[in-house]
Amino acid sequence: MEVTNTSSIMWFFRDKGFDDPSIDKMLRKCKQLEKAQSDVASENWDYLSNIVGIQERKLPYIVSRCPKILTLRLDERLIPMVECLSSLGRNPREVASAITKFPPILSHSVEEKLCPLLAFFQALGVPETQLGKMILFNPRLISYSIDTKLTVIVSFLASLGLDQDGMIGKVLVKNPFLMGYSVDKRLRPTTEFLKSSVGLSEDGIKSVVMNFPQLLCRDVNKILKPNYDYLKECGFGDSQIATMVTGYPQILIKSVKNSLQPRIRFLVQVMGRGMDEVASYPEFFHHGLKKKVESRFKLVKKNNIDCSLREMLDCNTKKFHEKFGFSEVTASF
């Protein structure tokens, strides 16, 4: 019987465009395929394509990542999960996108995995309207153990002082991918670097994590330290760097070559400004160099206007023109 089923599923895969090496790889990955029935596989394939709305060209990729999908009973596993995910999203395409990002999400049980996960995040203060956004944006969340993975990360965040007013929930909504990192290998080393090297206070750490939690996920030696060292080379003092990182955490992950260096060079050599000014307005590194900084500097210089970086950049185009009395004609020259 197994030989017949294996032969049947082989023909199914070949009919869908899979070559023999790919089929062999899937059979090794999922032993259940050897007993899979082609009619079940075909029914599941058609459901994902016609009902869920996954593009036919993407299905081979999805199935190769999680061949188990084709062995599951449609009514028992696939349909309940898809319907539950659909209830969390605003757009049907979000479900198809989530499945494409992480195909194994379909192999998990709604009752055993998804419902407990949703309850876990709700208890952390994640609004019901944001639950779907989190799961569909990072569907891999469903694969993490609540007891051995998620709870450990929540405890770590709480140790940073984020245990009040739903702070942890807000952090996770901003960056659901944070839950995929190891506390010991990534989150704690990054936090220690921010404390010991950058000199952030406990309140500074809380501010950074609340405003830009992605910073905790970056590698210290590959990204954060090189940026910190560059800022030191530029002449910024310890307290200035701490203030800049607190005010604009992204400064530690911006490309030194493509972002920080060109802006510092323009600031000093072209604008004739001092480093102290950018230390008090680190958002300077957020603005586009050519489209915003250079164009606005040309206007204020041409009109002999004396203003701070914040006054020049911290507003939209309309308010900038109104503030300095520029007409659209003047601004175009």
UniProtKB/Swiss-Prot annotation:
InterPro entries: MTERF, MTERF_sf. Pfam families: mTERF. GO terms for molecular function: double-stranded DNA binding; RNA binding. One of its GO terms (biological process) is tRNA processing. It is found in: Plastid, Chloroplast; Mitochondrion. GO terms for cellular component: chloroplast; mitochondrion. PANTHER family: CGI-12 PROTEIN-RELATED, TRANSCRIPTION TERMINATION FACTOR 3, MITOCHONDRIAL. Transcription termination factor essential for chloroplast development. Required for maturation of 16S rRNA, 18S rRNA and 23S rRNA in the chloroplast. Binds to a specific region within the tRNA(Ile)(GAU) gene at a position adjacent to and downstream of the 16S rRNA gene. Required for the maturation of tRNA(Ile)(GAU). Binds to double-stranded DNA. Belongs to the mTERF family. This is Transcription termination factor MTERF6, chloroplastic/mitochondrial. The lineage of its organism: Eukaryota, Viridiplantae, Streptophyta, Embryophyta, Tracheophyta.
